[in-house]
């Protein structure tokens, strides 16, 4: 019934629905294609849906030199792009037909065989190689990509065909190790790959990513876990791989290398169990104040408390820990540090200043509750909050009595200059004089291209003319 509908009606149906699959129910499919304005690529749709019979019909049309195949529907670019896409998916029959109708097996810099290798489609790889694909292109990139993803059968096949697994300075074993492909690593070693290339990059990557069995194997083969100033334990600690850290310590890694970098990085990234273990093994968390600052910066309250319990003196770091916690919005850390006696008013209330600049209104409220003067320096806090566009902070200060007109209406001028339209509107609603200093607010907004603010200020009575 459906294929009896006239082509003109099908054009309207497909245009309206956007369902390109409807074309395939009509015998006038190829005549319709030229009439329908659909963004979907016809070949791409057929390939994505594995419509092999339709593709076979395309081959027939190609042999008949049909104008659609030679012209607007199939182009070399679309064939090559869809060849690569199907090498990714592993649709070997589609791949064969795409090659039959003119796809370039070495197009896009031999991307077809590279993609098939990368995704582990061994039968596709074999077929492409059989058809003449240059599997050694880009300095044997195909075998390196297969190693990276752990496709052992692909690697073995490519090696059997002559690929050099040692290309690019033994990069294959580094990638395989970094991704935890133990059997691949063992195979590569059996083929003579140098596990110590690039200053033991393989074991460093495996440690960094927590692949314990790979690390153990590499150590058994002579890799140096202490290369690059004990890079392995520093990265394992920073990434929270506790069992890896324990193993590396058992193999004599230096946990205090680079001024206790391992425990500092674990503190920054929130790995409490790693920190506890490193401390039990002799890491010095009191030699400098970086650990407490790093933990405070990222809001790791449990680590901050643990470090204090282990003797870290929060006053040794000046007020840096509470300042950075305030800047990054970590209220609980701020409260805890204040409860432990840190001087949060140091450096002219910098802790407070950082919170208001970043818009952390709850921290601002807390610090005001702790005695910080929010009207200091002729209402500098509300002026700075306006300058930074922190509407919530501005509203809080105004609710507490801050003067929005301080310093000749600095707040509305600076918020206009920076493009903070909601702050501008709030300040105007609360009595700011938009015409202060010869309409400075609208002039600044105009100079900086904030057209919506200019329009708003003019609507509220500001004057913008040639003179100003």
UniProtKB/Swiss-Prot annotation:
Q: Which UniProt keywords apply?
A: ANK repeat, Repeat
Q: Sorted alphabetically, which Gene3D superfamilies does this protein's record hold?
A: Ankyrin repeat-containing domain
Annotated InterPro entries: Ankyrin_rpt, Ankyrin_rpt-contain_sf
Statement: the UniProt record of this protein carries the keyword Lipid metabolism: no
Report each ANK repeat as a residue range: 38-68, 78-107, 109-137, 138-167, 169-197, 198-227, 229-257, 258-287, 289-316, 317-346, 348-376, 378-406, 407-436, 438-466
| Pfam families associated with the record | Ank_2
The record's annotation in PROSITE patterns points to: ANK_REP_REGION, ANK_REPEAT
SMART domains, per this entry? Answer: ANK (SM00248)
Which PANTHER family does UniProt cross-reference here?
ANKYRIN REPEAT PROTEIN, GH09064P
What protein is this chain from?
A: Putative ankyrin repeat protein R873
